[in-house]
Each structure stands twice: as C-alpha cells, then as structure tokens.
C-alpha cells in the first residue's frame, strides 16, 4: 500500500510538471535574467519539507525534501541555459525518498530556465520539469 501511494505521488508530481503555458514556452531558449545570488522554493505541493534551490555564482545548494544537496551549474543568461553538474547530498533515511529522487533526477535533466516575475521554471528542451517561487 505504501509503495502504491508513493508511486501515485511520484506520477502526480511528474504529470503536473509536464504541463507548460504558451507564455512560458515562447521564452524557452531566449535571454533571461541572471540567476546568481537567488533563492527559490518548489511551487508544487509535496508531503514533507518543500525542496529548495539556492544559486550563488555557479554553485547550487538546497534541500531536496529531506537531504541537503550541493553541486555546480553552468548558467547562461544569454540563452537561458541551465545545466546542473555532478551533485552530492547528505544521506539521511527519509520517508519521502521517491519524491526526493524524482526532484534530483529532474534537476539533473534540466537544460533551460525561464524567469517570469517571481517564478523560475526549469525545462528539458521545451518540457517543463520544475517550477519554483522566489524566496526572501
């Protein structure tokens, strides 16, 4: 029963992340504001701690829902490029590990970003993977 619940949660997260508005789609691959020194919180509702993304230069850190992660990213505002490099994380045992693994997997697949107001969207080509809201 627990595995079924986790599978349904993971499918819901993936399905909701696959949608894209035409306004966002038209901005993918175009010049974007710089991401350096920004903090973001995942906009999707997930059980447990909400994943975060902190960007300082080409270093990325945050919390994936239970474990903290860290790594590098190649970010190019001239074309909205975002490519996460190899990432590491703490290794705590977590109840929502499948959600965390999906989050980390999507971070690793992203290759573009779009900023609209206080919203950051990470894409794989034209497929929306993750949506964040700006944190203070």
Regions found by a protein language model. Give the residues of each.
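Lipid interaction determinants
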Residues: 6, 17-136
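Sec-dependent bacterial lipoprotein signal peptides
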Residues: 1-15
């Amino acid at each position: 029963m627990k595995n079924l619940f986790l599978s349904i949660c993971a499918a819901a997260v993936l399905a909701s992340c696959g949608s894209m508005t035409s306004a966002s789609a038209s901005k993918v691959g175009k010049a974007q504001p710089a991401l350096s020194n920004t903090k973001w919180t995942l906009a999707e509702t997930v059980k447990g701690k909400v994943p975060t993304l902190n960007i300082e230069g080409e270093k990325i850190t945050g919390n994936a829902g239970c474990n903290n992660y860290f790594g590098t990213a190649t970010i190019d505002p001239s074309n909205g490029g975002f490519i996460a490099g190899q990432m590491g994380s703490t290794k705590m045992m977590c109840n929502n590990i499948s959600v965390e693994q999906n989050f980390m997997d999507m971070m690793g697949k992203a290759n573009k970003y779009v900023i609209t107001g206080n919203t950051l969207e990470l894409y794989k080509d034209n497929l929306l993977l993750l949506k964040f809201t700006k944190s203070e």
